[in-house]
Design a protein with these regions (language model features):
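Transmembrane alpha-helix signature in integral membrane proteins
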Residues: 1-20, 129
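Cytoplasmic-entry segments and transmembrane alpha-helices of multi-pass inner-membrane transporters
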Residues: 16-50
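Alpha-helical membrane-protein architecture signal
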Residues: 27-30, 67-70, 77, 81, ...
Length: 149
């Protein structure tokens, strides 16, 4: 369960972190601050939110996912995704800032720029995944609320 939830959170969080790191847009500082704020979200709060959303009387209650084994990964994914997004943005931003002008000057297309910068930051991304896995494997509170018992 920890492995699958950390993989899913890593994929979503890395995508969000890359989008924020690569793009300059109005309100970027607010988005980064919001991501970093969500990194400190208490696990029990996440468990309660997911439980309320998917319980029988919640907006997604008709899906009948609560207390199922497959649904147990939802709480850690919600908990870990902001952590991965924030750490990815923090790790990638300096590399983007230094390498992007050179890559643009050499005529690299946007697709190639992204893959070159990801390759340049592979060790940081490995560390981000290991942290996500450690967080997922140590998570008990949110999973117990969503899974029962």
């Amino acid at each position: 369960m920890a492995f699958s939830s950390s993989i899913i959170a890593f994929l979503f969080g890395t995508l969000i972190g890359l989008l924020v790191a690569f793009n300059d847009f109005p309100g970027k500082r607010i988005v980064v601050t919001f991501m970093r704020t969500l990194m400190g979200l208490p696990p029990v709060v996440v468990g309660i939110i997911v439980y309320v959303l998917f319980s029988g009387t919640g907006p997604f209650g008709n899906l009948r996912l609560i207390y199922s084994v497959k649904f147990l990964i939802s709480a850690p994914v919600v908990l870990i995704t902001p952590i991965v997004a924030g750490m990815t943005e923090t790790a990638i931003s300096p590399i983007v800032k230094n390498a992007l002008p050179s890559l643009k000057g050499m005529g690299a297309n946007p697709f190639k720029r992204v893959f070159l910068i990801i390759g340049e930051s592979k060790y940081q991304l490995i560390a981000v995944y290991l942290f996500a896995f450690a967080r997922a494997i140590s998570e008990v509170g949110a999973v117990q609320i969503v899974g029962g018992n």
